[in-house]
Amino acid sequence: MAENRGGHGPGARGGYQKPKDAKRTMLRLMKYISGRKWLLVIVFLCVIASSIASIAGTYLIRPVLNELVGAGTLSDKLGYLAKMLAVMAAVFLFGAVCTYAQSAIMAQLAHRGTNKLRGELFDKMQDLPLSFYDKHPHGELMSRFSNDADYVQQMLEQSIVSVISSSLLFVGIVVVMLFTCAPLFLVTLLVLFGSFFAIRIVGGRSRKLYRQQQKALGEMNGNIQEMIEGLRVVKAFTHEDAAKAQFGELNDAYFDVAKDANFYGTAMMPIVANVMNIGYALTSIVGGLFAFGGMLDLGGLAVYLQYGRQISQPMSQVSQQMTSILSALAGAERIFEIIDMEPEVDEGVVTLVGAHKDANGAITEDRESVHPHTWAWKVPRSSRLTLVPVAIEPDGSPIELGQAVREGGALRMLAPNVDSPDGIWVRAERDGSLTEVKDLAALASHGWAWKYPDSAGESTLHIVRGSVRNVPGEDYCLTELKGAVRLIDVCFSYVPEKPILKHVSVYANPGQKIAFVGSTGAGKTTITNLINRFYEIDSGMITYDGIDVRDIRKDDLRRSLGAVLQDTHLFTGTVMDNIRYGRLNATDEECIAAAKSANAHSFIRRLPDGYNTVVSGDGANLSQGQRQLLAIARAAVADPPVMVLDEATSSIDTRTERHIERGMDALMEGRTVFVIAHRLSTVRNSNCIVVIEHGEIQEKGDHEDLLKQKGRYYKLYTGQNILD
């Protein structure tokens, strides 16, 4: 079901969620527009000037009326009137210019500030772990960029200035009214209390109904989205009538609450206007009596009545804008909640670098090639890893070699990378003793391994495959990237005390194909997510070419891995752009070569504009099979040594399936491959098939071995059980 978007989805603006710390959030938001403080000073001066101009322009009516009704010739009165009209026009024009200036400047500052805010939000979301997205619906996250950011922009652009301007105008009008006739202001004060009471009662009911309207609209929009996305299923099960009935109920519920909300919303202004009209009449009567009694001149009465009509406007504007401000501050808090989150932790120090390998197998770092053919792990000597020479036993286990010196008849092993002319080569046996090695060349097999300390003070050795550069004096060493991946007693849980994987151990040598088979939810995809370090394991170890993946920088680790997922996601852009997404610096020729190897070139050529055909939202104008072929081409252009292939469960025609299988075969050639299998026919040629259920490995072996065991795999293969 679609998530309920009632809280943040598109809807009426009348309801709002109160911010938790309005003052702190407002001060933080102001930093986004305070980069050019002199512009804020100009805005503030313009607000003051426009408020004064509005008050002064109205007050000029008083001397004009008093002059017109006083003694003097008609020509003198007309001359004075013309002069004062020119002054009034200049005052109001000045106020209009100041209002325009403040609006234009605040619009620029608000757009700039919101742009920066959205940028920080997007950047932070790129740095958050996948576990964050597991806990937050996509619609909720999208509302941060749309609704919440829009509310913040409107507040910065209009609401704050409007509240300041209205407050200044209100205070200015009150001061002038008191100056004009203080006793008459008591009547005005009574009217203001009446207006405030009406706004509070009607406005409170209106806000409550608008919140209900927003929730009802969110539920209705969620239903519409769900029905559009699942229209094929609705039609397949002939549930059109049920869908219509369900939407009708939601639509009617929205209509009922919207009707009441609009009634109270539209009733606000007439009620306040009637209260003010009654007050205006009462003020006119009392003011007239004051004028007849000589307490107030005619011009003063006219000005006072005009201010009496104007005083309700700033009150109403402040009330309306405070709702917008509180909505914006609540939205800003939701944005800052994400911005303040801790980014994905990465304590890795090992980096992936291009390398050059000479005829003798020696490697050096290649800093010139854009896309080198050989890659290596660059390991700082300051890390916890230590590269040591080893002898490899017949069972494949490593035994540390090193140089030692005799001290008092006993051997003491020197630190790794310490070359002593008097040193004696020895083996560090498992019982801790040292055995002298007379002739290194006589060892059946020897090489290098990474030495890892463990929590018990012991150490473990992980064999390095491929060439090694270990030059004393250099602050780093290089080991060739080969694609050997090992999961060693791995345990993992998304939620504490609810294990997903239990003591899983899987070994993949370079170039091997490892297939995971099991029911939905068994933990197959979780294993591949752990190899990518999308999540961190609870215990155990995952090594890549003998290096703990936790010691490899995540960006470098993921650059060395490729993935073709069952839910193929394509981005808006051309076919060429989507292939190049695998490696952004790939040339057109490299992208076309990747498409050919993925068996996608033939269908791409038949598209209206070939490789320049624009892919619509998530590849809706392509078939499922075509999207998969593009995903394979995208992985091929990245050319990683290790691949993760999650087979699609969608039904595709036999011909397209053969195209995809050939593309997959070409992509897997010469790489270490992890396959999440949904069709057993595709895993028969795997070096190892791992049957996993409930997070535990039940069986492990090649196709023939597992058939002989006649266990879970045998039942799946012979059709006695269903895979998914």
Spans of features found by a protein language model:
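An intracellular "coupling" helix at the cytosolic face of ABC transporter transmembrane type-1 domains
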Residues: 130-131, 147-156, 160, 164, ...
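Cytoplasmic coupling helices
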Residues: 2, 104-123, 137, 164-165, ...
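Transmembrane helix-loop-helix hairpins at lipid-water interfaces of multipass membrane proteins
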Residues: 40-98, 178-183, 294-298
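Helix-loop-helix
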Residues: 71-72, 77, 176-190, 260-333, ...
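Transmembrane helices of ABC transporter permease
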Residues: 35, 39-49, 94, 158-212, ...
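Juxtamembrane helix-loop junctions of ABC transporter transmembrane domains
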Residues: 14-22, 45-46, 53-69, 91-138, ...
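Alpha-helical segments in transporter systems
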Residues: 4, 27-30, 38-63, 84, ...
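ABC-type nucleotide-binding domain
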Residues: 347-348, 355-724
